[in-house]
Design a protein with these regions (language model features):
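Trp/Phe/Arg-rich N-terminal binding region typifying the photolyase-homology
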Residues: 1-158, 249, 358, 433, ...
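Soluble or luminal CAZymes and related metallo-dependent hydrolases
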Residues: 18, 54, 58, 192, ...
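Residue-level preference for long, well-ordered alpha-helices that form the structural scaffold
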Residues: 51, 55, 299, 303, ...
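Glycine/tryptophan-enriched, flexible segments
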Residues: 136-282, 389-390, 394-456
Length: 456
């Protein structure tokens, strides 16, 4: 059977060339490939500045990989696709499947307009919805058995993209690269597939074998920093998994990849839980309205050094250590008594690695209302967390210069020392011990002995 003349590869959350099944399918189906990225105005209006600026850099890197032939334009997806299909006689539009509400609804609208979409692969090693309980073919609600099922299911080997393939030369109209400036003073990681592969190579050489020991310590560069690259699809999780062995450290890293896949699976099976409670009873709890204390949390001025260092890291880098994400989330929900969605939206505005499923369900885990949730009575102590995971205070000093003059024994509780507030560090907005008891009292009111999922 003869090949079609041109196929479109429509890039979305997969800004890479290697290990890209949809791109490979497009190459194999036609004589030449038209690479396309469509800027969506609604998505742009809702996205954070840092994320957009990073995306702009990533698109430039992808364009370079394609020999400066990426077609890029802002517009309605149906209109743009129909124009290119007509101009180039395209029969098929190839995509990586998407499972979050926005992407799924967009693709359904495109297909309803009569455009044929060919789905190959997804942003995950195992597509959401495929890992099911062998007993009754229902989705898992708890991570540990999901992980066992996920490993048993397995995943394909990375797809091999040809080194050379024919790419359509775009007209000037389709070279509308966006100008998304990075906010002043913000320093994010380098964007693009090459940067992702380089970072992962460095991690496998210098960090992977000690990952289980170092991953929780905020002052150590002990994590892979792959979350942003996975969010934009600059690297595929299979590429990471392909390099893992069976040691404890490697398995710990594998389990972190599986957490991302678990949350994607949970959201796929419960599509409104990106904005709504997985455990509905938590809607009944008494919550406060955001005010001055929330503003202090947003600015990293709560008076709790470990919390403030984390929030300032987020503002400066568009990224935050996973340990501190849990600590600041617990502080917002259980010390300030605000609903998790408020913090989730703030993260969405500032995280470069913002992932709908991981973010929403990470917040719900900490709040105690999610699947496989942290027990409702677990309330992170922001002082003890700092002492445990930033013992010498190096992380705090890096982001909270008002406390840099304090010793390791002083820096976690500056209010106990005469010199603690001498450089302008703010006083505590709340007393943790008091708010912990208040949080437990509110939880007791809804009798949250064991949060139940919506399908329990």
């Amino acid at each position: 059977m003869s090949l079609a003349k041109t196929s479109i590869i429509w890039f979305r959350r997969d800004l890479r060339i290697n290990d890209h099944p949809a791109l490979l399918a497009a190459i194999e189906s036609a004589e030449q490939v038209l690479p396309l990225f469509i800027l969506d105005k609604k998505q742009i209006d809702e996205a954070g500045e840092k994320l957009l600026a990073y995306m702009g850099q990533s698109l430039r890197a992808l364009d370079e990989s394609l020999g400066n032939r990426l077609h890029i334009i802002e517009g309605d997806q149906v209109e743009v696709l129909k124009e290119l299909i007509a101009a180039h006689g395209v029969e098929e539009v190839h995509i990586s499947a998407e499972y979050e509400r926005f992407g799924a609804e967009r693709d359904a609208r495109v297909e309803a307009a009569g455009i044929k979409l060919v789905r190959t692969g997804s942003p995950y090693a195992v597509t959401p919805g495929r890992v099911l309980k062998p007993s009754d073919a229902t989705p898992y609600k708890v991570y540990t058995p999901f992980y066992r099922g996920w490993r048993t299911h397995g995943y394909r080997a990375p797809a091999v993209t040809p080194k050379k393939f024919n790419v359509v030369q775009p007209t000037d109209k389709f070279r509308a690269f966006p100008d998304f400036p990075m906010p002043a003073g913000v320093n994010v990681i380098e964007a693009g597939e090459a940067a992702a592969l380089k970072r992962f190579k460095e991690f496998t050489k210098n960090g992977l074998d000690s990952y289980d020991e170092n991953r929780n310590f905020a002052s150590i560069d002990g994590t892979s920093k792959m979350s942003t690259y996975l969010k934009f699809g600059e690297i595929h999780p299979r590429t990471l998994l392909e390099n893992l062995g069976e040691s404890k450290a490697h398995d710990t890293f594998r389990k972190e990849i599986a957490w991302r896949e678990f949350y994607a699976d949970v959201l796929f099976n419960n599509p409104m839980t990106d904005i709504d409670y997985y455990a509905p009873k938590f809607k009944e709890m008494r919550y406060d309205k955001p005010g001055k204390q929330f503003k202090a949390w947003c600015e990293g001025k709560t008076g709790y050094p470990f919390v403030d260092a984390a929030m300032r890291q987020l503002l400066l880098e568009g990224w935050m250590h996973n340990r501190t994400r849990m600590v600041v989330a617990s502080f917002l929900v259980k010390d300030l008594h605000l609903e998790w969605q408020i913090g989730e939206r703030f993260f969405a505005d500032h995280l470069v690695d913002y992932d709908v499923a991981s973010n929403a369900h990470g917040w719900q885990w900490t709040a105690g209302c999610g699947t496989d949730a942290s027990p409702y009575y677990r309330i992170f102590n922001p002082i003890e967390q700092g002492k445990r995971f930033d013992e010498n205070g190096d992380y705090i000093r890096r982001y909270v210069p008002e406390l840099a003059h304090l010793s390791a024994s002083e820096i976690h509780e500056p209010w106990l020392f005469l010199d603690g507030y001498s450089k302008g560090y703010p006083e505590r907005v709340v007393d943790h011990a008091t708010e912990r008891l208040e949080s437990l009292a509110r939880l007791q009111e809804i009798k949250a002995d064991k949060p139940l999922g919506p399908h329990a």
